[in-house]
Amino acid sequence: MKIAATIARYLLGAVFLFFGSNMFLHFLPMPPLPPGPMRQFTEAMATSHYAYGVAFFQVAPAILLLVNRYVPLALALLAPVIVNICLFHITMAPGGLPQAVLVVVLWFLAVHPVRSAFAGLLKQRA
């Protein structure tokens, strides 16, 4: 399980570093967007520069995962990003849902060895 978790951590870090840095460097061409809510959402994210904040919270934790430092913090920072990726694909682009599910699986595999770091968050009472 330790090897699987390490591989998952590196893959998760690589995925978020690659796609997060694409927002800053634009090395992947964007396909034309279909009309409708997905287009409006993507245009709003781009024109408001909100996407740069999201990209930062992809790249910074990705680097932490790849260098194996502050791994629980990196995983905690990626959790809301992953939830939003899943919600986006469930509601607007179901074709990308398998990739989103893969990211969720990688996240859970990476969390497993450091789950004790999150134990305090799951206490019913203080």
Question: Predicted segments — roles?
Answer:
Residues 55-60:
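Core segments of transmembrane alpha-helices
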Residues 18-54:
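Solvent-exposed, well-ordered loop and adjacent helix/strand elements within mature globular domains
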Residues 61-67:
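Conserved interaction-surface patches within small, structured recognition/assembly domains
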Residues 1-27, 52, 67-126:
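Extended, low-polarity transmembrane helix blocks
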